[in-house]
Every structure is written in C-alpha cells, then in structure tokens.
C-alpha cells in the first residue's frame, strides 16, 4: 500500500514584518490628510467665494402677501450692497434685513442656482388701530404699517401703554359684545397709565369708566342712557360713570 504524505513547505514564513519606514510613510500620509482637511475646513468660505463668478442679482417673492411688495424686498436687499454668489452668500443676514420691516413677522430665504433668491414672508395681521398711528395683532403685538396698505375696514381704535396691549384687546372683546347685545355700538377703548378705562361709541360719545371693575358701570350706562334728555341744540359729549351711583353727562353744542 502506498501512502501519500503531504509535504510541508519549508520556505513559507508567516507574519512577515514590513520595513519600519513603511509605518513612517503611512503616519506622514495620514497627518498630511488631516492638515489638508483642516485647511479646507477653515478656508471653506473663501474657497466657495472664489468659485462664485455671478453675484446674486434676482429674487422671487413667493406666497400670498397682504402688505409686502417686491419693491419692499428690493429696497431691503439694496441696503446690503452687492451680494455674493450662490456659494459664498450667507442667507442669515438677508433674512434679518427682511425681518427688519416692521410688519414682517418672519422670513425664509433660500438660494436658487445660479444667482437667485426665493423669499417667503409671514406678516403681522392687524385687528385694531393702536394709539392712532400703529396697529396691534390679536395676541397683543404692536407694530407699524403704512395705513395706505391697510385692506381691512372699520378696525376698532384701541390705545394704552404697549405693555397693556393684550389686556386691552381682551377687554375690548368683552365690552364690544356687551354693548352690542344692547344695540349699542362701540368703536374703541383706551386705558391710561393709571389704569382708567374709556370707551368711545360709534356716535363719538365717550364713556368714562375709571379704574377697577367696569362691568357694573356698563350695566348702569345701559340703564340710564335711554333716559337722558338731550336739548335740540346739544349733543352728548361724555358720560362719566366713575361714581358709585348715577352718572355725570357732559354736553356740547351741535
């Protein structure tokens, strides 16, 4: 019987060591790569700017806007001087510039290749005039808006210190509903620095309610108002309800 024996090669060496300089070269290559990446990272903005050959020069105002026009956006952008290109221009300062418009609640700015901007704005919505030359939102934010752009008609006239704006709106809603339920229309209210309330009716009569609880005073007004005797050549200027009972009525010539 012939038995085949497998010969073990004697010339094969396992785990052959590589020259020491190989590790030095590898470490140097890794270090070189790290320095390259750091250089790119810290000079990324300048690299992108050099790649830009067309500064941003156009924009699109998207969405439905009640007060903001393309001219408003154009004027805001022109204040920033010449913009950079698609890669180099940061949109954050553009967004801040647009949000500086007093009636703009917020803005979203996106870059569009190769040299355009897409701009969307959110606007404050006025529910009333505030101190004659301003406006106020439902949640009490006071802002400015050119009155010629106002589309809503017959807004109420509210007034007071700005920090009281939300309280004034809440009180207005209550007073308006209260009087309307008695077929009396109001067009505005005001609170002064001392916390005293005044209500202006649509016929320009002023109700002086003073400080504190105004509900009982309104009830008294609703009761006595139809009983006031007004001479033919006179009209009611104000009704002072700052008393525990009754009221003082001021009249002027027609």
From Swiss-Prot:
It comes from the Bacteria. The chain crosses the membrane at residues 28-48. Pfam families: FtsQ_DivIB_C, POTRA_1. InterPro entries: Cell_div_FtsQ/DivIB_C, FtsQ, FtsQ_C_sf, POTRA, POTRA_FtsQ_type. Residues 54-124 form the POTRA domain. Residues 49-254 are periplasmic. It is found in: Cell inner membrane. GO terms for biological process: division septum assembly; FtsZ-dependent cytokinesis. Residues 1-27 are cytoplasmic. Keywords: Cell cycle, Cell division, Cell inner membrane, Cell membrane, Membrane, Transmembrane, Transmembrane helix. It is a single-pass type II membrane protein. Essential cell division protein. May link together the upstream cell division proteins, which are predominantly cytoplasmic, with the downstream cell division proteins, which are predominantly periplasmic. May control correct divisome assembly. Part of a complex composed of FtsB, FtsL and FtsQ. This is Cell division protein FtsQ. It comes from Haemophilus influenzae (strain ATCC 51907 / DSM 11121 / KW20 / Rd). The lineage of its organism: Bacteria, Pseudomonadati, Pseudomonadota, Gammaproteobacteria, Pasteurellales.
């Amino acid at each position: 019987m012939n038995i085949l024996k497998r010969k073990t090669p004697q010339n094969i060496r396992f785990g052959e060591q590589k020259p020491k300089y190989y590790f030095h070269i590898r470490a140097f290559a890794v270090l070189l790569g790290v320095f390259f990446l750091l250089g790119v990272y810290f000079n990324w903005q300048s690299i992108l700017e050099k790649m830009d050959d067309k500064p941003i020069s156009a924009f699109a105002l998207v969405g439905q806007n009640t007060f903001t026009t393309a001219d408003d956006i154009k004027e805001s952008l022109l204040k920033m001087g010449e913009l950079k290109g698609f890669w180099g221009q940061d949109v954050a300062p553009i967004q801040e510039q647009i949000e500086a418009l007093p009636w703009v609640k917020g803005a979203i700015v996106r870059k569009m290749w190769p040299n355009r901007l897409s701009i969307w704005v959110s606007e404050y919505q006025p529910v009333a005039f505030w101190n004659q030359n301003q406006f106020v939102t439902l949640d009490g934010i006071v802002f400015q808006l050119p009155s010629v752009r106002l589309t809503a008609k017959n807004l109420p006239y509210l007034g007071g210190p700005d920090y009281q704006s939300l309280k004034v709106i809440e009180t207005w809603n209550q007073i308006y509903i209260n009087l309307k339920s008695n077929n009396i229309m109001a067009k505005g209210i005001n609170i002064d620095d001392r916390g005293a309330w005044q209500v202006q009716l649509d016929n320009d009569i002023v109700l002086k309610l003073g400080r504190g609880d105004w509900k009982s005073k309104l009830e008294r007004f609703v009761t006595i108002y139809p009983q006031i005797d007004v001479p033919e050549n006179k009209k009611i200027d104000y009704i002072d309800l700052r008393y525990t009972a009754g009221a003082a009525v001021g009249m002027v010539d027609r």
